[in-house]
């Protein structure tokens, strides 16, 4: 966003769900290992960047691929845009091809980014620049990790834990 005296730039590097392994579920909502960045507190972002507000930050409960071991869940982050003419740029991956499962595991959910504007949903590409207007709601969904092994081999205990935690099999 161009503010008085120059540009006000916010940069965030998103991770997502990691793939499952032969003995464990994938990690949920993990930052990219290559970014050396941490999860920034929402309050810090909003105090430093007055052009948006975070209105949702949640796990995508059905984004991890089903399997003997479940792929990690991605997350959703939604921003309410507070000013006109805010430029949003994205450089993402796994928008078209889902993260694959292995040895019978299901794929994780694909990533997506879209803008809700006046009752319309504007789907954005994985690599795109877009101008946001006041009142727009920007939604970023990161992908889930692929599952490992056949879903019917998932232990009863792990299924019970999934149910208790509100995690469902990937149906995306």
PLM feature spans:
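Glycine/proline-enriched, intrinsically flexible loops and inter-domain linkers
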Residues: 1-172
